[in-house]
């Protein structure tokens, strides 16, 4: 049974085409992975099928009475609401039914016998619905899902406007799961989640009976939970049955076959054109030349899609620093309250270290404390000599209206326009991306612009806070290679073991230092 049908979808932004006459279907029970490079239109597609964005052309048709739940990381949480308020809002339709039930009860005393029968029937229907959807144990359900995603550690009475990006993602995901929609649409749900909660979400999706569409660049996660792949590339959307690894094999074979057919056809075209050019003027061979020309005119010419530029990150190593990058003595980090026990840590020149642990226990706070961006509650942190620090923040807030070119030029005013464009292209951005405002780019494209700033300055220590969030597979692979080749020190926060395990020499588990219950 088809739950969603998309036919002849065409859409673009200005002169940048995203989709050209594509089709899509979602069948009952399908677990679909929506994959493609940054900027190919995955989030745009989800916004179109949910009605948040009107396509230029095409037909989107959902089955009747289907409840769709969409995890959109750009959703704004209302100021003044607590985490508990947001989670309980998942049951707003049940609370509305309760209000209706109470209104009926208040009116029973004034009802006629005929009205009484109708009202009692409606009352019974409402009570059955409330019981069926566990209305009377909502608080227990909220606590159960909140615990599974680590929200109890944050505190359910905490104001949602005080939350980090990862914590907001958890709240939105928990609300979505509590709503129990017929269809889940998940846009990079593992971004900002720690390993423990990614594992929980993986188990949940593997056992999920209904259909879902998942956008994710976390390939091990994606591969375990999906059974259909839709691949976005060059304005096309193609369906593959099987997991991601099977898709890679089939895609590679199809690409090789197309390239071989293209080469054969180009050879044939060259030979036909040569024959026509040599023989069209001679009376004895003119008819044969005309026949060859007709064949050329009728030929369906194979076109190879333009290759997207693959990122080639390479960090520039500056001067040699002193032996120690930093040393802390009895350092207690936090904002209003301590997040850690007293920490005495040191990092030496050339070391590459990963910081791991659950969200909210102080990994980002530790980085900012080392950099001096926030004051320590107590203790000291002493930076080493001759440091050239490169810092990649997890979140950059604000509505950036500058173009990518302007963004890099502001950072490197001595660059020529050619050097600016070349630097952005090496980070995997096309000409149209380069000339666009940063704010209209996808999360992955914005991350590439920020990485462009980092790779073009001399550094000897990199502090990277979740740099893989939003990055596509090619960009992650290139970033991993760049970190392996980098001669300097690296302090890295990352929730993807398959990314950091080959890069670092040591892993610091922040859960051993935190004062929070986890």
Say what each PLM segment does.
Residues 250-305:
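Intracellular alpha-helical coupling/juxtamembrane segments of multi-pass membrane proteins
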Residues 313-315:
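Post-kinase regulatory C-tail/linker adjacent to protein kinase catalytic domains
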């Amino acid at each position: 049974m088809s739950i969603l049908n998309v036919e002849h979808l065409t859409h673009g932004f200005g002169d940048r085409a995203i989709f050209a006459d594509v089709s899509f279907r979602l069948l009952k029970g399908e677990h679909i992975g929506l994959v493609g490079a940054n900027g190919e239109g995955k989030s745009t597609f989800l916004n179109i099928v949910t009605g948040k964005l009107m396509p230029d052309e095409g037909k989107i048709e959902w089955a009747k009475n289907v409840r769709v739940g969409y995890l959109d990381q750009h959703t704004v949480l209302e100021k003044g609401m607590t985490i508990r308020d947001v989670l309980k809002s998942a049951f707003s339709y049940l609370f509305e039914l309760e209000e209706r039930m109470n209104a009926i009860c208040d009116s029973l005393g004034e009802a006629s016998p005929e009205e009484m029968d109708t009202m009692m029937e409606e009352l019974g229907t409402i009570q059955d619905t409330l019981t069926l959807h566990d209305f009377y144990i909502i608080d227990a359900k909220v606590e159960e899902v909140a615990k599974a995603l680590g929200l109890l550690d944050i505190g359910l009475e905490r104001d949602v406007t005080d939350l980090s990006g990862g914590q907001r993602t958890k709240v939105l995901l928990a609300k979505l799961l509590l709503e129990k929609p017929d269809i889940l649409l998940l846009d990079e749900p593992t971004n900002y989640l720690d390993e423990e909660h990614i594992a929980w979400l993986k188990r949940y999706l593997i056992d999920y009976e209904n259909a879902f569409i998942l956008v994710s660049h976390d390939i091990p996660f994606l591969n375990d939970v999906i059974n259909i792949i839709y691949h976005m590339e060059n304005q096309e959307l193609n369906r593959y049955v099987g997991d991601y690894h099977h898709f890679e094999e089939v895609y590679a074979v199809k690409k090789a076959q197309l390239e071989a057919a293209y080469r054969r056809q180009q050879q044939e075209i060259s030979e036909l054109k040569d024959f026509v050019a040599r023989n069209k003027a001679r009376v004895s061979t003119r008819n044969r030349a005309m026949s060859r020309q007709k064949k050329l005119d009728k030929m369906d010419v194979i076109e190879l899609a333009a290759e997207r530029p693959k990122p080639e990150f390479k960090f520039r190593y500056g001067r040699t620093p002193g032996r120690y990058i930093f040393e802390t003595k009895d350092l207690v980090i936090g904002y209003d309250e301590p997040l850690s026990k007293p920490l005495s840590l040191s990092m030496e020149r050339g070391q590459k270290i990963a910081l791991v642990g659950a969200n909210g226990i102080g990994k980002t706070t530790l980085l900012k404390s080392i950099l001096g961006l926030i004051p320590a509650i107590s203790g000291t942190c002493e930076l080493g000599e001759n440091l050239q620090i490169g810092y990649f923040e997890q979140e950059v807030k604000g509505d950036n209206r500058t173009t990518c070119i302007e963004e890099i030029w502001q950072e490197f005013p001595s660059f020529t326009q050619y050097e600016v464009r070349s630097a952005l292209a090496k980070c995997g951005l096309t000409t149209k991306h380069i000339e666009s405002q940063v704010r209209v780019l996808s999360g992955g494209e914005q991350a590439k612009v920020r990485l462009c700033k980092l790779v073009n300055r001399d550094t000897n220590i990199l502090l990277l806070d979740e740099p893989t969030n939003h990055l596509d597979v090619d960009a992650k692979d290139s970033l991993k290679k760049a970190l392996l080749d980098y001669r300097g020190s690296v302090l890295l926060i990352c929730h993807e073991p398959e990314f950091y395990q080959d890069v670092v020499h040591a892993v610091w588990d922040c859960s051993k230092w935190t004062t929070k219950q986890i």
